[in-house]
Amino acid sequence: MSVVRAEIRVLLDFSKRRGEVSMGWFDEQIKQRRKNDEDIFSDAFADIADAVLGTKRSSSNDGNDEREIGAIWKILEYYKVKPQQLPSSVKTLNDRLEYLLRPNGIMQRNIDLESGWYKDSIGAVLGKRKDDGSAVAFIPKGISGYVYFDDESGKWERINAANEALFEEEAICFYKPFPLGKLTLRSLMRYIVETLSVSDFVFVILSTLAATAVGLLGPKLNNLLMGTVVDSKDYQLLMGITIFMISVSISSLLIRGITSLLMARINTKITISVQAATMMRVLSLPADFFKKYSAGDLSSRAQYIQSLCSMLVSCALNTGLTSIFSLMYITQIFEYAPALVFPALGVILATLLFSLVTTFYQMKYTKKQMELSAEESGMSYSMITGIQKIRLSGAEKRMFARWSKLYAEQLRVAYNPPLFLRANNAFGAIISLSGMIMMYYLAVRSQVGVADYYAFNTAYGMVSGAFMSIASIATTVAQFKPTIEMAKPIMDTIPEIAEGKPVIEQLSGGIEISNVSFRYHDGMPNVIDDLSLKIRPGQYVAIVGSTGCGKSTLLRLLLGFEKPQKGAIYYDGKDLAGIDLKSLRRKIGVVMQNGKLFHGDIFSNIIISAPHLSVDEAWAAAEMAGVADDIRKMPMGMHTMISEGSGGISGGQRQRIMIARAIAPKPKIIMLDEATSALDNITQKIVSDSLDTLKCTRIVIAHRLSTIRECDRIIYLESGKIVEDGTYDELIAQGGKFAELVERQRLDN
């Protein structure tokens, strides 16, 4: 073993010496990339040593809160995610949850545990003990309720009224995500099965089987009543059989009620999980996806995923199980009236066939109605959000005419289908009535007894109901196609979250753009054309150029909103395409050109990217953004409500609140796209001086060139290429494109 260790040590020393070779002109970005390679290289040799020697490296979590990490691992195991070791630099609870849960798409939110919270279970919960503040995982167990691992006893304990007081009221609830790849019917079915517990399936199957077994008594009792009891003229026997039949009816009603409650619980469980997973998937989709659909249209399409899951549950558990078990009633038809079996089955099959033909014929109209409904929802939402613009232009009547045209088409499809579909119910009634007349005739000809006919009629009704349930399954299946097509854009688009992509823990602020080219559509010219740029940590860089030169597009590429067709972008030597984008964006403060505030109070708007920040930290960010005095003058200060359209505040206040939001988490990189266009020179100077104190990398896009005089570098773009690069004074002295742009602005002013 000592020989193996020595050989591995030599290899590691060689790799380090190899990394210490003089790098000449290469800057810090190349050094960082080399360091990343060396870390991976060293880890590979350490893994070989572990495999050969049978040892295990000491955990990087030494000194961390073992209980907290252990609780998070138990939650990961519950969601069938393999736990991984945490870097020593990840120390806070928020950072640990981000590092471990984010790459797997697991969602979380803060909740309050009210009295009796343990009686039902939806997802795993992370809580804390009152005595020592240590973290504890609450894991769903059985048909309802939670269990937790007691470190003292070393056993899993069920939470109940006696021990719920041991835990703090504040906790974090977690939700299971959809698979991170493309969603299919199979993956949705697997998601539903994994969301439900074994007890959910067992209880539903048992209750359905019990309801069917009780139902089998109906034909038997009818035969006994109309035969033996009536022939005997025994009053006591009549009373006894009557009481028994009433008891059977009540039992059947109770069992079906229990089944309905179980199904309602399952549907609620599925609905909560699916809605949370759908929202998380929508929020995780690439930015360019949202260009294709309006907000209302996308909202409607997201709801169809929930509809699809409800259909799957109904087919598999509710209608499906009932239909299968109810087929046992066929044996009773053979028992009481063999001569009527085939005519009865013929009528049932004819009704079933007619129902299926009608359903599949209606599919294309259902799809059309869904599409029109989604389109109408999108237009309605756009009209409501843009009502101020509509009124300013006096276009109320024109907008109503556009909406009513779309709505009328939707009504036309819904209320004026072909004659065959409109007369569907009448045709079905004719088939059923004709079948009953035929069976009455055959019963008379076959001389079926009264008692046997009553029993047959009861069994026939149950068999007919079973086949109609099968028809309803076919109807539901027929609706799968239009429903899937409506939800297909969300299901097919792969989220930005990808399992295995590393979470960004820290940023130094170094950025490298290497030979990047980008166009929005094939066949169009490049907006960014073979652009290369290196930005050192802490640099203050301005990007300028005429309208359409690619400034905002470059910013979108840096944020991962667009993917380059060629080249790569690196942060601290790490390729943007290979890292978790959300964790990167959380380390960057951004104010986009058309940025908006969210509906809510000012405090919520400032801390939205860092919910753990306190009110004092929000005030500090507002001071740096030069908006604190304005907030103090507002009716409720930091808790003043802002409407969706940012009503009640000026454009300058809106921009400064967005700047406060960007700088509140103290990011290492700040990107501003025309973020101070509505500010006067004095306020802009306050903001600029405050940003200087952050000691972070700043990338600014500005049309007002007087605001970038203090920049370390100014990049002039033209047709997606860098044509000039230097300080303000250097570019003015060159007398090139930038100097011409400055001169034009002076003349305009």
Each language-model region and where it sits:
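ABC-type nucleotide-binding domain
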Residues: 504-749
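Transmembrane-helix motif of ABC transporter permease domains
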Residues: 198-218, 224-272, 280, 291, ...
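ABC transporter TMD-NBD coupling linker
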Residues: 281, 374-378, 382, 386-391, ...
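Alpha-helical transmembrane segments of multi-pass membrane proteins
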Residues: 248-269, 320-324, 343-369, 383-387, ...
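Membrane-integrated ABC transporters
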Residues: 1-218, 231-240, 259, 263, ...
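An intracellular "coupling" helix at the cytosolic face of ABC transporter transmembrane type-1 domains
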Residues: 198, 287-288, 300-316, 320, ...
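Helix-loop-helix
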Residues: 230-247, 329-349, 416-486, 490-491
